[in-house]
Regions:
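Serine-hydrolase catalytic core recognition
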Residues: 40, 175-319
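Beta-propeller folds
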Residues: 1-184, 190-196, 200-201
C-alpha cells in the first residue's frame, strides 16, 4: 500500500487564499509538528524521514510558501519525540530553544534564527524531562530533570551563565505548572511515603500556600500498615548493566519461608515504572495477601541517557 503524501498549507482568513508551503520534493516523510514563531509571518515546520532519524525544522514564509532550513539533526538511532514538543521560540523574536541528545543525554540548547547554536544551556550526565519555558524579565530557563537520581524528578531554573537553582526542596517526584509570566508555579510532589502535596510557589521558590496536603489520605492509609516498595538494583543479562527495580514484601514476612513472586513491568521504550512517587494499587493488596511483588525497568527505559534508552533500537524483544 502506498504511503499517504503529506503537505502543509496556510490559509489567509482575510483574503481567503490558501498557500502551500515548500517542504521539498521527498514525499516519504512525516510532518510531526508545525508551530508559529513569534513573527506571525513565519511558520516552523518539522520534517522527519520515515526512519525518524533525520529531523529538519523548516522556517516558512507564510505569505508566499518559501522555506529555509532552520535546524537539522541526525541520530544513529532515532530522534526522540519529546524533542519536538520542547521547541520554544523566545519572545525576543531572534532565538529558540530545543532539546537534543547529541551529547548522549537530553539537554537544552539555545539557537538563533539563523540556525547557529549559541550555547548549551544545561550540561551533565543526566536527562532533561520537561522544558517549561523562558522568563525574559528574570532571564531564566525553567526545566525538570533527573540530575539527582533516575528515580526522582525535580524542577530547576538556570540562567544563560549556567547559574542553577533547585525550586522543589521535597524529595520525590515533582510536577510543575507555571503561570504565563513565571511569577508563580504550582508544584505537585509525592514519594513512596507521602501522597501528592499540591502547593503554590512564587518565582523565588518560596512556598506561598499549600493547596492540598492529603494528610487525611496519609493517616487513613497508615491504619492498614501496607507494604512499601524498597528500591534495589539487579544485574541485566549482560552481567554489567545494573537495572533499577523495586520490591514489595509482605509486612510480616517470615525468615526462611517461601513466598510466591509476581513481577510486573511495562518496559516500553522511554517508559518508567520504577520511581520514587506515591502509588497505591492492587499490588499493595497482593503484598498483604502473602505475595512478594517486584517491578523492573530494563534496558530501553527512561532516565539513564541515550545509550541505555535506545539500545533496544532494532533489538526490541532481544535485550
Amino acid at each position: 500500500e502506498t504511503n499517504s503524501i503529506v503537505s502543509v498549507h496556510v490559509y489567509d482568513i482575510k483574503d481567503r487564499v490558501t498557500t502551500p508551503m515548500n517542504i521539498g520534493e521527498e514525499t516519504d516523510i512525516y510532518i510531526p509538528r508545525i508551530k508559529w514563531t513569534k513573527d506571525p509571518k513565519r511558520l516552523a515546520i518539522m520534517k522527519l524521514n520515515r526512519f525518524q532519524n533525520h529531523l529538519e525544522i523548516l522556517l516558512a514564509n507564510a505569505r508566499v510558501g518559501s522555506t529555509t532550513v532552520l535546524y537539522r539533526e541526525e541520530n544513529k538511532y532515532y530522534i526522540d519525540e519529546s524533542n519536538l514538543d520542547n521547541l520554544v521560540f523566545l519572545d525576543n523574536g531572534t532565538q529558540f530553544v530545543i532539546t537534543s541528545e547529541k551529547s548522549g543525554y537530553m539537554h537544552l540548547y539555545l539557537y538563533d534564527l539563523n540556525g547557529r547554536e549559541r550555547q548549551a544551556i544545561t550540561k551533565g550526565n543526566f536527562d532533561i524531562i520537561d522544558f517549561y519555558g523562558y522568563d525574559p524579565v528574570r532571564k531564566l530557563f525553567y526545566y525538570s530533570s533527573y540530575e539527582e537520581s533516575p528515580l526522582e524528578k525535580y524542577i530547576y531554573s538556570i540562567n544563560e551563565k549556567g547559574l542553577k537553582k533547585k525550586l522543589t526542596p521535597v524529595k520525590g517526584w515533582n510536577e510543575a505548572s507555571f503561570s504565563k509570566n513565571f511569577n508563580y508555579y504550582i508544584n505537585v510532589v509525592s514519594n513512596t511515603d507521602t501522597p501528592p502535596v499540591t502547593a503554590l510557589y512564587n518565582a523565588k521558590g518560596k512556598q506561598v500556600r499549600v493547596l492540598e496536603d492529603n494528610k487525611a489520605v496519609k493517616e487513613a492509609v497508615k491504619a492498614y500498615n501496607l507494604a512499601k516498595p524498597e528500591f534495589i538494583q539487579i544485574p541485566a543479562a549482560d552481567g554489567k548493566t545494573m537495572l533499577n527495580a523495586w520490591i514489595m514484601k509482605p509486612v510480616n514476612q517470615k525468615t526462611g519461608k517461601k513466598y510466591p513472586l509476581l513481577i510486573t513491568q511495562y518496559s516500553g521504550p522511554n517508559s518508567q515504572q520504577v520511581k520514587n512517587n506515591w502509588s497505591l494499587s492492587w499490588l499493595n493488596y497482593l503484598a498483604q495477601e502473602g505475595y512478594i511483588v517486584a517491578c523492573i525497568d530494563p534496558r530501553g527505559t527512561a532516565a539513564r541517557g541515550e545509550e541505555f534508552r535506545k539500545c533496544t533500537y532494532m533489538q526490541l524483544g532481544k535485550l
